Amino acid sequence: MKLFQKKNTTKAALLLAACFSALPALASGFPVTVDSCGQPLTFTAAPKRAVVHDMNMSEMAFALGLQPSMVGVTGITGWYKATPEFKKQQGNIPELAPKYPTLENLLAANPDFFFAGWNYGMKVGGDVTPQTLGKYNIKTLVLSESCIHVDKTRPRASMDLLYGDMLKLGKIFGRAEQAGKLVDGYKQRVA
């Protein structure tokens, strides 16, 4: 009888351990859905292989400490002179293309996420769009201020759009609280 109880106790302990090990995944807030140019974009987990286009979007990612999840940046040296601080934050993250990335540039890095905008890494009718990348299971967060290039009813660039994109990026990567604190700090500096 004691052997039977011991086996059942062991099974119960293993079952409880399995249940509790799943709690961090639930507590992290996934799945999450954000708006990307009027389209819902859902993540069941934070991206692990992100590519970010343009210096400003890269700086947003760096501010959230996303470097460990980044496999590339694009559109830096072809348009800008990177500061020593930017280069330090970029670290060993390679630049995949100095200006606009090609589909081949991106696929070679095997990303699961691309943060770019219309006329900021993507061109209407080009090879790199949310639709073309979606065929390769690459989710694209479109910079909100660029949505006006594909939908004239969308709002023009504003600080609120920038704040919203930072909050979306934080939510996607499981860093919503950190993003909220950054946005609050930005708002205080601008006020």
What are these regions (language model features)?
Residues 2-4, 16, 20-60, 171-191:
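Bacterial Sec-exported substrate-binding components of ABC uptake systems
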Residues 29, 36-38, 45-48, 52, ...:
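Extracytoplasmic
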Residues 7-15:
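Sec-dependent signal peptide recognition
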Residues 52-109, 113-121:
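A short, structured surface patch at a secondary-structure boundary
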